[in-house]
Amino acid sequence: RMLFVAALMAALPWGASAQVEKRVEVTKAYVPKVESASKLAVQPDMTDTARMRPEIDYTITPLSLRTTLSPRPIRPATVTYWEFNRPLPFYLKAGAGYPLNSVLDFYASSQNPSTGYVVGYVNHEGRYADIKNDFGVKNNSTRMFNRIGAAAGKYFGRHILEGDIYYDNRMYHRYGAWADGDGAGLGIGGMNDYGDANVAVRFGDNFQDLSRTNFEIALRGGMFFDHSEWPDYGDKARQTALGARAKIARGFGRSRFSLEAGYELRSGQKSLEGSSQQLIHAALRYGFAGGVVRFDVGADYYRDRTEFEGEPSNLVKSENYVIPFARLDFNLGTPGLKPFFEADGAVTPNDFRALTLENPYVASSTWLDKSSVDYNFRLGLGGSLWRSRFDYRVYAGVSVRDNHLFWTTYRSLSDDPAFSEVFQGVLVPVMARQTVTSFNGEIEFRPVSALKFDLDVHGYLYNDETDLKNGAPSFAGNVGVAYEGRKVSFGVKALMQGVRRWTVIDLSATTDASEPVCGPSFEAPFGVDLRVNFDWKVSGRVTLFAEGRNLVNRRLYEYPWYPELGANFTVGVKANF
């Protein structure tokens, strides 16, 4: 009799899981192996009722361990700049000083990272002390700048709609004027007062991520007012401006392209009636970021058209300009030696508003028939040494300036005792070509992150295609030190420039306006303006400040015949709340 015994084993799955940001499931499987029992060698005798327990051999061979990780999708934590660093909505800077001066800056802002921003602001700067002019007379010398404005932006996905509106008021007094005898009715010490209202709107991108197409469309409008005090100046100048601009840019790998086009219309009213200027601008750029050289090249095209009322027909002039543009930076494998080449330029209209920004003492209602055109070229070396503690830039430059402005002054120098000697403090621009060769050096040294030393030196050689003095220095430079601490910050800087000269035209001796007779030129001496600033952070929101200017009390001039204040200072408070 044969006995057959079967044994069956089943291995049940065993699971384990672990949860540390992820779910882990581990499965092990075993496959049993069962073999047949060996038969006994002899026939057993069962009469003694003995029980036989046959031996059964079996083995278990586990399969290789298999582990499966099944991560669950987890939304990463995100934080925006505005959630991480929320600026306080209000900023105030207020101060006053001696001789009497004042400063005020106030900003109120609100920012929502998903909606947009809005900001309103007020700026004021004024000085009120009388200054003795070069004739030994103290006229009213009040000078003041005021601005009020608002700006806002609305986000539309990756694009933004922005707007800006503001009004400027710039007030000066002709304290450099003088008259021998009775100067009544000549406007001696009168006020030059300019108002400027502007509104602008743009829609588009910020041109930072060029992996997608970036674009911009912008519109601008403005109105300029002349409220100056002049005898018999009832129909005061007014000027309007309209402008439009469009730009598109895209990057492809290491390359990038951009195209820009713009249009400006400037029109005169009242005493400027019949004067207008149109400026069309187009610019093309191509850039490439290579390993050895990184460059941007292109060109700017301008069409400039001026029109003035005349008899028997209007006077019209049109000019076309092409200005090259280049930025080449070479990488020689070391941060301490980086050659570069730059070429650029600009076309600057010489309408009345632009001239008042260049020189506030310009003769009233002046509008020149050509724009100033600059072509600039620079070649040099730059780099960083000693783990970026020492930065330098050394270069030579050449500038060709067509229709450059040479500022002249007029003075009556009659020997007739019945005729008063008069200088009304008016500056008149005359255009001529100028070529400038310059040699420049700029150094910045940071031994530690909180301390900075800087030195700039610039030398100029002028080739003027006129006998008029250009009013520019042959040397200019500055040297300074600044410290930025956690509680205290301060800086000391000396601004220097060489002797400057302007042409003085003798109206009494001039008989032909095309050939003016020049008298002794006006000379501004070598100037050093020593400035000091100090900030003390009383708390995280309040800072006390002090600023000093012209502390060596030099005779300084920004405009000919108009000396600046001597040593002066301003103290006040800055607050965020």
PLM region spans:
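Exposed, low-structure sequence patches enriched in small/polar residues
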Residues: 92, 294, 302, 307-577
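Surface-exposed extracellular loop regions of Gram-negative outer-membrane beta-barrel proteins
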Residues: 110-132, 256-268, 273-311, 446-456
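Short loop/turn motifs that connect adjacent beta-strands in outer-membrane beta-barrel proteins
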Residues: 80-87, 112-115, 155-162, 206-214, ...
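N-terminal periplasmic/intermembrane-space "pro-region" immediately following the signal or transit peptide
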Residues: 16-82
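Transmembrane beta-strand segments of Gram-negative outer membrane beta-barrel proteins
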Residues: 52-72, 78-98, 115-124, 212-219, ...
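Outer-membrane beta-barrel translocator/receptor signature
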Residues: 73-74, 83-92, 96-135, 140-148, ...
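Flexible loop and strand-edge segments within Gram-negative outer membrane beta-barrel domains
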Residues: 127-130, 134-135, 139-147, 162-213, ...
